[in-house]
UniProtKB/Swiss-Prot annotation:
PROSITE patterns: H15. Could act as an H1-type linker histone. Belongs to the histone H1/H5 family. InterPro entries: H1/H5, Histone_H1/H5_H15, WH-like_DNA-bd_sf, WH_DNA-bd_sf. Residues 1-30, 81-213 are annotated as: Disordered. Residues 26-97 form the H15 domain. Residues 1-25, 102-113, 123-137, 157-176, 203-213 have a biased composition (Low complexity). The keyword DNA-binding applies. GO terms for molecular function: double-stranded DNA binding; nucleosomal DNA binding; structural constituent of chromatin. This is Histone H1. One of its GO terms (cellular component) is nucleus.
């Protein structure tokens, strides 16, 4: 027994073999490969699954289980809101629009120290308005009666045109009667005859000179 234990102690314990460093992955994560494929293809309505797979296989070294890993990565990305399939699970794939980062809250501008307010000049007391003399009920009644009386008065008649004054008729002058010696009555003419116009005097002839003998 003692010999066995001594031999065991004599043999040094075997060192654990150093671990081999893990092989570096030959491609980035499937999420990154999907994102790069969609970005590079630049299709407006999204890229089809076949186009994305073809891009990944031609640019990265993938293993045999590529299809399984591709489908799982796509499903997880849709659930997390990283990818969008507008036409359903078998349709095209698009990148989800990133929401704009919330704008940083603006710092409130430091308020300037308010200048001390000047004491407002005391306003002059407004002069009390004269109370309007209340109209008595009697005055109101008189006004109403006057309005009614004015409404009842008929419109004034037009002034009658002045009558034309007849021109006075001239009476004939009384006829004067005269008696002649023989007793006959004669009527004197009342109308005065116009005085006969005097003939213009004929011009005097110039005296002829006497002939000399």
């Amino acid at each position: 027994m003692a010999a066995a234990t001594a031999s065991a102690a004599a043999t040094p314990a075997k060192k654990a073999a150093p671990k081999k460093p893990a092989a570096a992955p030959e491609h980035p994560s499937y999420k990154e490969m999907l994102t790069k494929a969609i970005t590079e293809l630049k299709e407006r309505n999204g890229s089809s699954r076949q186009a994305i797979k073809k891009f990944i296989q031609s640019n990265f070294k993938v293993k045999d289980n590529f299809d399984v890993q591709f489908n799982q990565a796509l499903r997880r990305g849709v659930e997390k809101g990283e990818f969008v399939q507008p036409k359903g699970p078998s349709g095209t794939v698009k990148l989800a629009k990133k929401e704009k980062a919330a704008a940083a809250p603006k710092k409130p501008a430091a308020k300037k120290a308010a200048a001390p307010k000047k004491d407002a000049a005391p306003k002059k007391a407004a002069a009390p308005k004269k109370a309007a003399a209340p109209k008595s009920a009697a005055a109101k009644k008189k006004l109403l009666d006057a309005k009614k009386a004015a409404a009842k008065k008929p419109a004034a008649k037009k002034a009658a045109a002045p009558k034309k004054v007849a021109a006075p008729v001239e009476k004939p002058a009384p006829v004067k009667t005269t008696t002649t010696k023989s007793g006959r009555v004669t009527k004197a003419s009342t109308t005065s005859k116009p005085a006969p116009k005097k003939k213009a005097a004929a011009p005097k002839k110039a005296a002829t000179p006497a002939k000399s003998s």
